[in-house]
């Protein structure tokens, strides 16, 4: 039985999409708790973030047979993972962040538009690093 095209594939992608930002949010919340002096609370957030990472990795293990949920490219072997990373980062710096910056600027959010443009530059750098690394092992 193939996972490709199934409702279960959709569910795994949805679950992965939920777990990944939860990890980042909890790490951010931990940082805030540290600043406010709640070290024990920060530890709870960090521990839970690590659990969310484990959940996301579990979803990816099942999704390996159908491809990267972000790019649709094959995942599993390092060369394929690097190629997928290049594609994902390239999308972010060529389409995603420029489009978001344009929208933010049109809506009058200049500082946020500048932030998105800064991120586009960072993503371009990431894509270049991944591409260089891929070429070095090919």
Where are these regions (language model features)?
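Non-heme di-metal
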Residues: 1-138
């Amino acid at each position: 039985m193939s996972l490709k095209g199934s409702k279960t594939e959709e569910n795994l992608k949805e679950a992965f999409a939920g777990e990944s930002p939860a990890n980042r949010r909890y790490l951010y919340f931990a940082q805030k708790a540290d600043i406010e002096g709640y070290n024990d609370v920060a530890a709870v957030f960090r521990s839970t973030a690590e659990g969310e990472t484990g959940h996301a990795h579990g979803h990816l293990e099942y999704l390996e047979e159908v491809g990267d949920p972000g790019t649709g490219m094959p995942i599993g072997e390092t060369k394929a993972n690097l190629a997928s990373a290049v594609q994902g980062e390239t999308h972010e710096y060529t389409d995603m962040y420029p489009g978001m910056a344009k929208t933010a600027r049109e809506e009058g959010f200049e500082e946020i538009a500048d932030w998105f443009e800064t991120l586009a530059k960072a993503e371009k750098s990431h894509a270049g690093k991944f591409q260089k690394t891929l070429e070095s092992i090919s």
